Every structure is written in C-alpha cells, then in structure tokens.
C-alpha cells in the first residue's frame, strides 16, 4: 500500500512499503529446536523454526479452555510435541519454547498475572507448568510484546528505534520497543492498551472497569454491539449498507484512533504498526481510525510518527518468539 493521506492529515504518514533491514544483533548459539507459541482467547498457534528463523512446521487450533489453565497447558503440550517431532531425528535435539500470552505477565518468573480472554487465568505459573510437561526450557512473554519484537526485527518496524505494535483482534494489546530495547514496565505489565478507559460510562469490560478500549473497539465488542457473530460479519453488513453496522464500526475506529493519538503524544514514537483481525473490516475502518489519530494528537509530535499496517500477519508473535530466544537483549531471563 502506498502513501495514504486524508484532508487534515498532512503530517500523518500511513505507509506499507518495506523498510531497509538493519544489521542483525548478535545471537546466541542455540542448539536444537526452537518452538514459538502464540496463545489467544480464540486460537493457539505453534511453530517449529529452522536455525535461520524460517517456519518449518506449524499448527493452529481453537483454544480449548476446558476446566481452566491446565486444559490449555495440556493442549499446548500436545501441539508443541506435534510440531517439534515432525522432523526426522528432531526428538533427539534439545528444545526451547517461547510463548506469548494475552495478559500481564512476569517474564522473569514466568507467571501470568491475569488474562481477561482466558477464563480462570490468575497468577498462573505457566513457565513451571510447561517446563514440567515438556521437560525443556520455556520463556513466557506478553503476546503483543512478542508481536512487537517480530515486527521490529523482521516486519514493518525494521530500522525503527522507538516503535509500538498494536493488535486489535479478539482483544486489544500493545508491545513497545524503546531505544531498540523491549519495554515491559516496572513489573512486566506494560502493554495493556486495551484497558485504557475511553468511555467512562461505556460497556462493562472483562477486567471489571467500564469503557475500556477492549469493551468498545475489540473484535468481540464490535460483534456484540452489532448483534453479530464476528467483526468480519459486521464489516460485510456495513459494506452492504447496514446503518447499525456502519455506526458500530465508525465508533470503534474513532475510539481506537483517539487512543492511538494519546499514545503518540505520550511516547513520541517514530512508528506504530497496527494489525489483527479487526483490520479486515476494510478501508473505511482504517480511514476512520487515521482521522481520529489526527484529532487526538499534538501536531508537532504526530508529524514524527508513521502509522503502518503490520507486515507479518498471524506469524508476528511466532517470529517474535524465535527472536526472543535468539537475540540477547530481548531475552526474558
């Protein structure tokens, strides 16, 4: 996608062209298999990587919530074993697994503090559970942080030192790279962009507050407000002229854009890459978001920030998992 501008957005660049690659940082000499896992409220993905970072095998399945965290851990264990043993002789090699989880985590302890889209997930010692089940070293990270690492190393954010990735899918999250280093916050909980309150009298969020971005602009919120089964269904209805669907998408895009504008003001970012299933809602949703970014940000700061579509699609978290293992400054422990 080329340069996209709207009236009044002369200093807001929206691009999709690849950026030049930067020299790769030093890497650990990791022997054996590396498996990345991207755990979401709807889907869980696992991929086995080649030593040079290409995906050799992958598997995707609906998240089996079952009786809670243990059901999901059992499912992840089965998926990881499946992809990691798919290559002849691979079972003899050591393995490292890196997993992204949708909620605040302590990456040092490997504990998931909470995950609003994963029922029953409170203070879950995920690293310990996975290491016990798989018998290998495991790293645990916020899913949007892994996606940010993937996009900054090999996607839209290549060469950008101050970068954020925003995912808008089942839920909404953010990952930050500041001065070329992952920013996790004081306790590892940075990135809960979906719980920025944008409508204090709005719908109740899973976290217990009202009017969170998650509750008004996520895929689940869009579908709920329109009485549909998914945000894609809402987008199809909007394209066909359904006025309710159009109004729901317009409101979600505006809330998201205003929140992004505030993020630009706060962090003086060079680039924000956005991705996730909701952007399948079409150009009107994108344009509405971009317009609201302009309204919600300070022009002097905004002119320095590009907004781009993420480039790695559903692989960004998996690629970020590989980079987390292989790149020293991005390791969780």
Annotate each language-model stretch with its function:
Residues 2-96, 105-111, 127-138, 150-160, ...:
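ATP-binding/phosphotransfer module of carbohydrate and carboxylate kinases, centering on a glycine-rich
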Residues 140-142:
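Short loop/edge segments at beta-strand edges and connector loops
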């Amino acid at each position: 996608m080329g340069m996209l501008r709207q009236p009044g957005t002369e200093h807001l660049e929206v691009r999709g062209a690849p950026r030049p690659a930067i020299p790769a940082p030093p890497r650990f000499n990791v022997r054996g298999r590396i498996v990345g896992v991207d755990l979401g409220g709807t889907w869980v993905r696992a991929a086995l990587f080649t030593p040079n970072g290409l995906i050799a095998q992958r598997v995707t399945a609906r998240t089996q919530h079952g009786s809670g965290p243990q059901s999901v851990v059992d499912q992840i264990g089965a998926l990881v074993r499946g992809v990691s043993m798919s290559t002849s002789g691979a079972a003899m090699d050591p393995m490292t697994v890196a997993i992204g989880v949708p909620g605040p985590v302590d990456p040092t302890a490997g504990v998931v503090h909470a995950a609003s889209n994963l029922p029953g997930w409170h203070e879950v010692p995920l690293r310990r559970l996975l290491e016990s089940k798989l018998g290998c070293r495991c790293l645990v990270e916020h899913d949007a942080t892994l996606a940010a690492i993937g996009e900054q190393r090999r996607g839209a954010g290549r060469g950008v030192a101050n970068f954020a990735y925003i995912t808008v899918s089942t839920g909404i999250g953010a990952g930050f790279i500041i001065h070329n280093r992952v920013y996790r916050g004081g306790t590892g909980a940075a990135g809960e962009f979906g719980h920025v309150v944008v409508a204090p009298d709005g719908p109740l969020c899973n976290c217990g507050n009202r009017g969170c971005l998650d509750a008004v602009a996520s895929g689940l919120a869009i579908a709920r407000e329109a009485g549909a089964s998914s945000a894609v269904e809402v987008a199809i209805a909007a394209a066909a002229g359904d006025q309710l669907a159009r109004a729901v998408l317009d409101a979600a895009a505006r809330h998201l854009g205003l929140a992004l504008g505030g993020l630009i003001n706060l962090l003086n970012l060079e680039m924000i890459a956005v991705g996730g299933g909701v952007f399948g809602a079409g150009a009107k949703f994108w344009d509405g978001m971009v317009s609201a970014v302009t309204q919600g940000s300070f022009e002097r700061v905004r002119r320095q920030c590009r907004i781009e579509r993420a480039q790695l699609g559903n692989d960004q978290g998996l690629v970020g998992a590989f980079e987390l293992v292989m790149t020293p400054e991005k390791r969780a422990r």
